[in-house]
Amino acid sequence: MWKEKVQQYEDQIINDLKGLLAIESVRDDAKASEDAPVGPGPRKALDYMYEIAHRDGFTTHDVDHIAGRIEAGKGNDVLGILCHVDVVPAGDGWDSNPFEPVVTEDAIIARGTLDDKGPTIAAYYAIKILEDMNVDWKKRIHMIIGTDEESDWKCTDRYFKTEEMPTLGFAPDAEFPCIHGEKGITTFDLVQNKLTEDQDEPDYELITFKSGERYNMVPDHAEARVLVKENMTDVIQDFEYFLEQNHLQGDSTVDSGILVLTVEGKAVHGMDPSIGVNAGLYLLKFLASLNLDNNAQAFVAFSNRYLFNSDFGEKMGMKFHTDVMGDVTTNIGVITYDNENAGLFGINLRYPEGFEFEKAMDRFANEIQQYGFEVKLGKVQPPHYVDKNDPFVQKLVTAYRNQTNDMTEPYTIGGGTYARNLDKGVAFGAMFSDSEDLMHQKNEYITKKQLFNATSIYLEAIYSLCVEE
């Protein structure tokens, strides 16, 4: 029944999704304003959702142009469906323009198809189809739309300051059958705060180093600019050998007497950096072989001592595991250095329940002082957990099982979704076990089958939660 309903809307679903995907809704603080708190792209994507909602007869409510909601249903209780329309930067290496959606026979290719514009449109159409069926709603629905999920969650922070907290809810921003727990997440900077003068003339001086754009992405590109006093050819040959030994792609060029070294890695979501290749950490590993100036040497040595080849916090003394949520993970998402302001490592750390986060951070902060570094802590989100046997969770899982015959149990993840904003919130789709996960990677795509099947599952789930008694 549900799949047949969705079939009637397939062309509309694709057209509305294409319109949303064409908006480059990457956070841009340089263009932020009161009317566009995280830049014009995210604001435009939020407005787009309002426009299709108004077209279809829904009421909307805007919250300072950074978040808002589409309203449906009636009743005392509220089901929240928490989506986001911002995306991470596209990065390089795409086979097509990431903001000009390509629709093939069986897929749609663009930044945001999986994370989270495709699932957002799927959830929206589930609500729209039920509304078109004139169902007898027993709950209200607030489809809450954020514009800063990929960065600081300013959107939901602002939204929940003044707006009604849903009784229960889900975020269509992960996998099926259901994610009932999420690790704690924090970002922090390790800042080089002690600079020293060189007593002797160094053979090499690190002028600048840059790798990574986002804390929650493994950097796939790194560039170092090095002033080489002698043996330029030897350094280039050593670098080429290093790339070969580590199965890496990279390049070396000379620009006005400065040696420019680049390394290409593999970008993946920061919740599991072990499956990516951190270009920045590898390039620092090579630089450690050079007799650099003191400050650069301290920066490079710090990376090798605490960060390189340590995806689970081992070198930071933070290795920890639980059977329910798994391991601590540490992603070094941003690395910068220049010879005037020294260096910075931007870390995204995720931790399971039971990990003594504050104690671990205090110990680490004290330890790294001796190497001229300090911790600057950002936002901390504690772990989030809902019992998988809760009737709400079971209704979602039943809808999934009815349509897939897949009896996989709900599980927990290292990723963070809007679900953690709610006391009773879980992540629910829209990826299936056979979906290729290219979130935060080049050539991100969603299959039409996945898009329509997710819509159908959301349709049944929302019906069981908000229409049936």
From Swiss-Prot:
One of its GO terms (biological process) is proteolysis. Gene3D superfamilies: 3.30.70.360, Zn peptidases. One of its GO terms (molecular function) is zinc ion binding. Zn(2+) 1 binds at D115, E150, H440. The active site is at D86, E149. Coiled coil: none annotated. It comes from the Bacteria. Binds 2 Zn(2+) ions per subunit. Keywords: Dipeptidase, Hydrolase, Metal-binding, Metalloprotease, Protease, Zinc. Its EC number is 3.4.13.-. Its cofactor is Zn(2+). Belongs to the peptidase M20A family. This is Putative dipeptidase SACOL1801. It comes from Staphylococcus aureus (strain COL).
